[in-house]
């Protein structure tokens, strides 16, 4: 009986070629059933009918969806990689960050962090994420110095000229944070020691990046083009907070408006 019932699970998807092709493609691109369903609910894809997340899950578990079942990302408990911290002079803590930043009212207020190589590897990855649009910018740093961090940040500023403020942790690589503020023309706010949740947006993005750069990876062995591909994947997620637009679409929309956007 179970076998008979399973045969008809996901029938709505199976019988609609356009819908099935879209669902299969997006699952293979690591989109979640929630994201796919939400995207269709907001009519972001022309000519493709809406399907609920429950129907997508049933389809995946059916005999028709078996071949792509492995494409669904399994959420894993993430361990926080600790880097050396210490006393940094002249910091402005997150307590003094303007309330408008806390409310995600404008583009340009970012959080930034490092992803580090596994044991025996070298190199780090600078990750900068816009708090409002969730769009991420990645720059690998192969020789880890304060100067290299500043250079990587300036490369991101060229691609993300809207960058106005940044919230980060107390890594000693930010020892010359005042200098970095002048170079980037931004203000930097620091989280309290061991309060990683105060920069939750970039922490969540790091988790998405880890799908493509698992724990233990050696960043020095990855090319810049690899990180551009990862960046594109991360910025192609359908996000509920963006009304199921992708971060790339949201950024393009804001830039097209040619004004400071207050709402998506």
Question: PLM features: residue spans?
Answer:
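Basic, flexible linker segments flanking DNA-binding modules
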Residues: 6, 48-102
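Short, basic interhelical loop/turn and adjoining N-cap
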Residues: 31, 41-54
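Short, basic alpha-helical/linker "hinge" immediately adjacent to a nucleic-acid-recognition surface
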Residues: 1-29, 39
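C-terminal domain-tail junction helix/linker
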Residues: 215-264
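Mobile genetic element proteins and their domesticated derivatives, centered on retroelements
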Residues: 23, 36, 56, 113, ...
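Two-metal-ion RNase H-like nuclease active-site motif
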Residues: 107-117
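Active-site beta-loop-alpha junctions of metal-dependent nucleic acid enzymes
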Residues: 118-121, 138-160
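RNase H-like two-metal-ion nuclease catalytic core shared by retroviral integrases
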Residues: 168-170, 175-177, 190-213, 220-232
């Amino acid at each position: 009986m179970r076998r008979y019932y399973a045969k008809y699970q996901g029938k709505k998807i199976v019988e609609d070629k356009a819908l099935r092709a879209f669902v299969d493609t997006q699952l293979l691109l690591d989109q979640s059933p929630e994201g796919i369903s939400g995207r269709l609910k907001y009519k972001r894809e022309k000519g493709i009918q809406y399907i609920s997340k429950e129907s997508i899950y049933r389809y995946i578990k059916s005999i028709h969806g078996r071949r792509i079942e492995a494409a669904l990302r399994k959420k894993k408990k993430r361990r926080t990689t600790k880097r050396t911290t210490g006393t940094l002079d002249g910091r402005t803590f997150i307590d003094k960050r303007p309330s408008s930043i806390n409310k995600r009212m404008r583009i340009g207020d970012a959080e930034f962090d490092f992803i580090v190589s596994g044991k025996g590897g070298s190199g780090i990855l600078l990750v900068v994420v816009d708090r409002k649009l969730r769009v991420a910018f990645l720059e690998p740093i192969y020789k880890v110095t304060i100067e290299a961090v500043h250079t990587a940040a300036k490369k991101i500023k060229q691609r993300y000229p809207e960058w106005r403020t940044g919230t980060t942790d107390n890594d000693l690589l930010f020892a010359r944070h005042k200098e970095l503020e002048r170079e980037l023309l931004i203000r930097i706010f620091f989280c309290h020691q061991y309060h990683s949740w105060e920069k939750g947006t970039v922490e969540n993005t790091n988790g998405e990046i880890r799908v493509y750069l698992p724990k233990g990876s050696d960043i020095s062995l990855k090319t810049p083009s690899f990180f551009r591909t990862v960046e594109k994947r991360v910025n192609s997620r359908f996000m509920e907070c963006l009304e199921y637009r992708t971060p790339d679409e949201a950024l393009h929309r804001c830039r097209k408006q040619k004004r400071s956007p207050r709402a998506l």
